[in-house]
Every structure is written in C-alpha cells, then in structure tokens.
Amino acid sequence: MFERFTEKAIKVIMLAQEEARRLGHNFVGTEQILLGLIGEGTGIAAKVLKSMGVNLKDARVEVEKIIGRGSGFVAVEIPFTPRAKRVLELSLEEARQLGHNYIGTEHLLLGLIREGEGVAARVLENLALDLTKVRTQVIRLLGDTAEVSATNGQTKGKTPTLEEFGSNLTQKAAEGKLDPVIGRQKEIERVIQILGRRTKNNPILIGEPGVGKTAIAEGLAQRINNRDVPDILEDKRVVTLDIGLLVAGTKYRGEFEERLKKIIDEIRVANNVILVIDEVHTLIGAGAAEGAIDAANILKPALARGEMQCIGATTLEEYRKHIEKDSALERRFQPVMVGEPSVEETIEILYGLRDRYEKHHKLVISDEALSAAAKFADQYIADRFLPDKAIDLIDEAGSRVRLMNSQLPPAARELDKELREILKQKDEAVRSQDFETAGQLRDREMEIKAQIAAIAHSKKGDEENTKEVSVVTEEDIAQIVAAWTGIPVNKMTRSESEKLLQMEETLHGRIIGQDEAVVAVSKAIRRARVGLKNPNRPIASFIFSGPTGVGKTELTKALASYFFGSEEAMVRLDMSEYMERHTVSKLIGSPPGYVGYNEGGQLTESVRRRPYTVVLFDEIEKGHPDVFNLLLQILEDGRLTDSKGRTVDFKNTLLILTSNVGSKVIEKGGGGLGFDLSEDQTESQYGRIKALVNEELKQYFRPEFLNRLDEIIVFRQLTKDEVGEIAEIMLKEVFTRISEKGIQLEVTARFKTHLINEGYNPIYGARPLRRAVMRLLEDTLSEEFLAEKIKEGDTAVVDVDDDGKVKVLLGEKLELVAN
C-alpha cells in the first residue's frame, strides 16, 4: 500500500511515528496520524484543517487529555493500531472513488473522517469541527485544484504528476515570463514539421552550449500561445520535464519507474502535451539501479509509436557520447542542428532582449554597447559561443554600471562607518548598564541617520533634476571583456598612450643596443593596442637570431615585465626540453590512451588561461623539427587545436622565437675579401653578418616556416661602450642586494675599467661580464663578510691596485662612478 503514497503522505506517517515517540506510546493510532497531517503543513489536508482553525498546539493538548502520556519505553519499530490500519485502508478506498491512483494527505484525512469512531474523530469534535463540513471542504479543494490545472494548461485530461515534475512553458509564455526568441525561423519550422509526423515525431536539438537550443523550445511555446502554428499544434501545451526532480526522493525500488510511467500515461490520455527534456542525455542511466531499467528504455516504446511528442536538447559532444551509442534511442529522435548565429544575427538577438535587461538593471543600454558586445565576444572570447557570451557581457556590464551608480557618496560612507562604531559602543554601554552614555550615543545615532538620509535624498533629488539615467556604453563592455580575458580592449588613457610612445626609451633602460629589435617589438605592441592589427593573426611573430649573450631572451623578459606586468607574465618554452620527437605532445597534450591525456598541453593550456601574453620559444633550433610544423598554424591563422579537439586562440599573443643559428658565422666576424671602402665599417660588417645568418636560417628551417614570420631580427654584437652600460646595470643590481644587508657599496673608476676589460668579449656578449662581476666583486665581498671585515652600517669602496688585484677599503672616499 505504501508504494502508492505521495511523498507528503509518507512524511505524515513519519511525523505520526515521531508524535508517538514524543508521547511515549509504543503504537501509532488515528490521533497520531491526525497530528502528522497537521504537522506536515503543506498538503491539502493541512490547508483544510488550518483554514478551519485547527493548529498543532491545540490538537496536541486535546490528544493528551484523551489518551495521556505513555510509559516512556518506545520500541524502534512502532506498529499501527487496528483502527489506524483501518484508516489507511479507507484512505485507499477514498482515492479509488475519486479516480486517483495515489494516496495523498487529503485521502488520509478523508479516511479518518469516514472511520469516525477513533480518537482522531473525537479530537476534531472537541475542537468544534463538523466532520461532514471538513469532508466537503477537502473534496471542494480537490475539485478546485483539478479545475485550476485544467484551465492553466489548456488540458483535456488531468496531468497532476507531470505538473509536479514539469514546468508549463505555454503558460509562462501567456504570462510574459519568457524572453523573446529572435530569428531561428528555420529551426522552429523544422521542429514543427517533425512534430507533425505520425510516428517518431520527436525532434532533438543538437548544438554547442550557449547557441540557443532551449530558446527554440521557448519560441515554439510562444508561437502556440500566439496561435501562430498549424492547426495540429494549436491546442498543444509545451511542458519541460525536470529529470533531477523526477529522480529526487525516490528511495525505494520502482518508485522512479512508477513516476515516469504515470507521466507517460497522463501524456497519452491528455494527448495535447509536447514534452521538452533539456539535457536529454541525462535520460540514459537515470534511475537505473542494479537490475532496473533506466528512463531512456522506459520511454522508447512511447517515443517510437507516436504516443508522446518529445523535444530533446543536448550538445554535440553529449549526443555523440550517449545517444549515438544507443542506436535504438537515436532512431526515435530526428536531429535538428542548431548552429552558432553570426555577429549580425547576435546583434539582432541583443536588440530583442534589450528591454528585459534595461528593466532588470534599471538603466539604458546603448546601440553601440549591443554592437560591441557581439563583436568583442566573437573576437576575444574564444572558448564559448554566440549569442550566450554576448548576452553575458551585456548582463554583467549592466550590473557593473548599476552598482557603480548606486553607491553612496563618500561623505555618507564616512558617516555610515561612524554609525556602525556608535552602535557598537551603545551595545557595550547597555551591557555594562551605563545608561547615561547609551542615551547620549543613541542621540548621536539619530543625528547621523538623519544626515545619511538627507545626503541620500539630495543625491536622489539631483538625479531626478538632471534626469540622468545610467547608460551602458561600449567602454563598459570593453571593461568587462578586459576583466574576463585580460585583453585590453578599452580606450587608452593619456598615460597609457604616453607609455606606448615612450616604449623604446623604457626598454633601452634594460636592453643596451639592439635598436632594430626594440623598435620592431614596440611597433607591434602599439599596432595591437590601437586595434590596427590583422584580427586573424597573432600580434606579431619574430625570430631573434644572433650571437649568444646579447639580450635576445632578456628583451622578451623586459617586454613582459614592462607591458604585461611581470617577467612571469609570459609563456616560456625552453625548446631544449623538446629534443625528442614524442615530446611534441607536451605542447598540445597527450593523445587518447596515453598518460596525461586529461591534463592538456603546456602551450595550449597556458594560452587558454591567459590569451593576451608573450609566448617565448627559447633556443628554437634545439627542438625537434616536428615542433616547427605545429607553429605553422599559429603563425598564419593564430589558432591551434589541442589533443581534445578544442581550438586555442593565439590571435592576442606576441610570438618570439630566439635562435643561435648563425653564431659560428658571427664568431668568424663576417669579414669579406678585398678592401672595405665603406665609411661605416661596423654597419657593413653587420650587413654581411645579417645576410650570412639569413642564409644559415634558410638551410636550417623550412621556407614555409620562415615565410610566415613577420620579421627576422639579427642582433648586433656588443661594443665595448655598450658593455660598459651593461656593467652599470649589473653593478646597480649588486648595490641593491648588498644595501638590503645595511652596507653601502661604492666602486672606483679604476675598478670599473678593470671590470669591463675583464668582461668584454665580442663573441660571447654580456655573459662574460656577468662572470667577471661574480668573480671580481661578489666573491671578494663574500670573503670580506665571512672574515667580518665588513659589518652592517659600513661603507665599503672596491678598488684595484696596480697589479690588478681587487681591494676592499672601508670608509675611504675615492673618485666614485656608481652609487
């Protein structure tokens, strides 16, 4: 019998057992069932009793008057009294007479009244209730609910189970609760055609997440409500089924199947329901315990025979993973592909939705903001789909503008802070019974509240006088895109414009020489930030080639630090780690079946997380040649597909490849035959070296790879003067480190000249200088530290004697070059 009970009826029985325990009785009688009915609170029985003035407290008093309290010993299993069992049987009979195939709280109450001789009936009589009137009221309420469901659903038959686990979209459309559906005429027409079939009349909407599959079902409901459909669909109602709610609370075996069968039977009898199941793949496996059958198999016969019309919606991936595997289920559904709308169609959709969002956020959304949302979403948000991502931009921009404009003025915020402090002090004064202080604080509290109210009122008055309405502009959309992706789309401030114009100067503070490289990188960044770059290619792609130790990797670090915030704000791939052929998979992720398949690739995952960044392929020639094949798509189209089939967008990255190809040529000096008659010998030598390096690159890299690069930049060898400037930078770094230990360090001009002579090597660049600083300065100082010759607070001067030996002098002031 209990399998027919509704969840509310089961709750009543459980509450009845609790009442028995509370009173110390080891049985459940009619009086406990009555207390359970009142205590349940939400069922028809509880509503009827409440409307007639019965409450739980009074009922408990009456029950205790009649039967008193028990011994206190209560068994775990509490049996029903014969009279209570009789009530349950009568409630089943009442349900049958009313044509219901379930037992609810209303049937239990009718059973109690019909039994008429138990303690429950006496309690109701003692509470001045007429049992006949209670019965009439229950039946009337049952009739009303049936009528309400009939009128709301335009139904011929009653569908209580479907209404419990579903949501009527046609009714929502009539109440204006659905967003308007713009476009999608072809898809809706195709859905209507499939619904008009005699058998297998079940369309399934397949498309990427966020393209508007559910919106098509809502569009159909709106059309039915507007009578803009063929006559075969005119009286239909569209009901969306909640699979989660259907499964929830099914504690016992067969309960889920029974619910689903009831829904199928109700739809078959009503014959005017179009069932919508969003995320239709959840049917497969839903409710399937060990040995039980799942929802999909229960629905199959009804779907094939045309007894029920069902619209499913799922993504391409889930369709392939779940439904295509079950060919018997697949043939019952007719696929309708829902593609991503174009930018123009998205703008139309946004125009249609504008009123709803303006009403919600209480502001105005400009036409430029709508166009910008569609264009920016398409260009900068790669891993989601239109129109969903564009709608999200509008929604969040509206929220941002509203919150910014609804904030209190600074004066009111200060007062609010003071008010909180006064309230805290007042509470403490009351607790310590210092009522005089509490009274003074209360007066101050009233003053501050009045001041805050006056400021808020004047702000509101100013807004009303100026008739200013908050407006969402293109700039607001750009701010949201920047917050989501890190790509600066918003208009440049004057300070940022100046920063970009002075970029070469700033980079030269760290990179000595190498004008060509610094200028090329700066131009690329400016082009991208102003928005003049090709939107389908990366910001720029360079090969930095040339001798070792001249600043190729350092320039990339300086760029990341200056423009992207920190040296770490770049994706750095040391190609020496990709020397074997199979390590290429580390870039885009392991193929299926291999270890690490679910982890994604180092390159693709980094760029997906941070789409606006510098990507550095360091020492490119050390990697396996197959790595270069991967780079072809990135360099040309700014895209790469990872091992899971996801397209990663490289259109907002700056690609830099460093290489030492040609360093042997540079080592030889690039000298030509005959006399050098040019005025500038250095320039002609650089020209020859550049030509030779380009030839070497052509021999090493494929032409289709080199042809895709924006520029091949050959770095110059460092002159002695440039090494002197680099020495200044390195010495400053040492001074900073040693000043943290409380020591002031100075070097003489003689030491500096000696350092440059020791560290200058045109073939190896600045690295010998770094070694010279370490050997001559850092090693000497560390020995002095350990010998405790230098202590905190000292001023140390580093010099060299005539033999070239480094000396550390304390407190002596010599001719200083660097501080």
UniProtKB/Swiss-Prot annotation:
Region (II): 472-663
Segments forming a coiled coil: none
GO molecular function: ATP binding; ATP hydrolysis activity
Sites where the protein binds ATP: 207-214, 546-553
Clp R domain mapped to chain residues: 2-144
Transferase among keywords: no
GO biological process, one term: cellular response to heat
Region (Repeat 2): 80-144
InterPro entries per the UniProt record, alphabetical: AAA+_ATPase, ATPase_AAA_core, Clp_ATPase_C, Clp_N_dom_sf, Clp_R_dom, ClpA/B, ClpA/B_CS1, ClpA/B_CS2
CDD domains reported in the protein's UniProt record: AAA, RecA-like_ClpB_Hsp104-like
Protein family membership: Belongs to the ClpA/ClpB family.
Free-text function comment from the UniProt entry: May interact with a ClpP-like protease involved in degradation of denatured proteins in the chloroplast.
Protein name, per record: ATP-dependent Clp protease ATP-binding subunit ClpA homolog
Species this chain originates from: Guillardia theta (Cryptophyte)
